[in-house]
């Protein structure tokens, strides 16, 4: 019996195509049907979740506020009237946007203490505002947003909207900040 795994079909020019790359493990087969939804792994973020959309919308609003000088009320009104978003997304995005701006005087020092080599005003606008949203959630949304979720969401959003190393930077800063907030899971043990 021969090993067919390295036998490649010639392409139109008669050349052999390279072997497909992969981990060599077959994908697990999941049953389809009622109750067979795949489980999310540790650290997975569902990109279409309501809260994820709200955080993204809040980031865009904070970014606009930071860089354009548009009025806070103008941005907030537009945020609340975005018909493309469900009301739950608009409501939570507005909570984050207004909460971050209201509490900037207490949020920015937390970030500055965790990253003393990087003055908050000099941080990239995306990184700065992702961190602000995460710190706001850690301080004021702990009943509905677990510590790990706030951190993982911030990292994912930083990866999606920030520079190449934004995810790592946000992860490091929030790792330091998170020590100030005991994790409910660990506290319950």
Model-derived features: positions:
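N-terminal interaction/assembly modules
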Residues: 1-167, 171-189
């Amino acid at each position: 019996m021969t090993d067919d795994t390295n036998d490649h079909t010639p392409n139109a020019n008669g050349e052999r195509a390279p072997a497909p790359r992969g981990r060599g493990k077959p994908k697990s087969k999941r049953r389809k049907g009622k109750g067979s939804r795949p489980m999310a792994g540790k650290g997975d973020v569902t990109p279409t979740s309501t809260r994820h959309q709200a955080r993204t919308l809040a980031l865009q609003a904070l970014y606009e506020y930071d860089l354009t000088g548009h009025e806070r009320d103008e941005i907030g009104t537009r945020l609340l009237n975005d018909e493309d978003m469900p009301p739950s997304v608009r409501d939570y995005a507005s909570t984050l946007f207004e909460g971050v701006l209201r509490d900037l005087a207490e949020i920015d020092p937390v970030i500055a203490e965790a990253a003393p080599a990087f003055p908050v005003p000099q941080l990239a606008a995306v990184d700065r505002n992702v961190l602000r949203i995460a710190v706001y959630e850690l301080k004021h949304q702990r009943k509905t947003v677990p510590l790990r979720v706030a951190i993982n969401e911030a990292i994912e959003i930083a990866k999606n909207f920030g520079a190449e190393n934004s995810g790592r930077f946000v992860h490091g800063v929030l790792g330091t900040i998170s020590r100030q907030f005991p994790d409910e899971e660990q506290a319950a043990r």
